[in-house]
């Protein structure tokens, strides 16, 4: 039997074994959207470092290893001893909202 003769019946049967269906003909809701999940984590991580990725970079822009970051007011782009850049508080900790 040729390769086409083997693959054709398999291709025809695949829609019958749809794992997205839960048996009653309804598709199961997706529990995760991995792309948006990882993007959300990146935004939270940037915000923790004093970065505001949503302000359109009206403030200081810092080229970090995870991409460009917009430093919040009272934050400056600083290079650490290991060579990585991040937004760090340039004044008193009370001047820099987290």
UniProtKB/Swiss-Prot annotation:
Contains 5 disulfide bonds. It is found in: Secreted. Keywords: Cleavage on pair of basic residues, Disulfide bond, Gamma-carboxyglutamic acid, Hydroxylation, Neurotoxin, Secreted, Signal, Toxin. Residues 1-19 form the signal peptide. Residues 20-49 form a propeptide. Expressed by the venom duct. It comes from the Eukaryota. The modification 4-carboxyglutamate is found at residue 63. GO terms for molecular function: toxin activity. The modification 4-hydroxyproline is found at residues 53, 68, 93, 97. GO terms for cellular component: extracellular region. Injection of the synthetic peptide causes a hyperexcitable phenotype in mice greater than three weeks of age at lower doses, and lethargy at higher doses. The cysteine framework is XIX (C-C-C-CCC-C-C-C-C). Negative results: has no effect on glutamate (NMDA) receptors, Kv1.1/KCNA1, Kv1.2/KCNA2, Kv1.6/KCNA6, Nav1.2/SCN2A and Nav1.4/SCN4A channels, and acetylcholine receptors alpha-9/alpha-10. This is Conotoxin Di19A. It comes from Conus distans (Distant cone).
């Amino acid at each position: 039997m040729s390769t086409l003769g083997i693959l054709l019946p398999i291709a025809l049967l695949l829609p019958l074994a749809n794992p997205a269906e839960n048996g009653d003909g309804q598709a199961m809701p997706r529990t995760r959207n991995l792309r948006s999940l990882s993007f959300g984590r990146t935004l939270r991580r940037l915000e923790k470092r004093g970065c505001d990725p949503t302000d359109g970079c009206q403030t200081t822009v810092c080229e970090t290893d995870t991409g460009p970051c917009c430093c919040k007011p009272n934050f400056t782009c600083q290079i650490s001893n290991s060579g990585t850049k991040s937004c760090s508080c340039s004044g008193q900790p009370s001047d820099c909202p987290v």
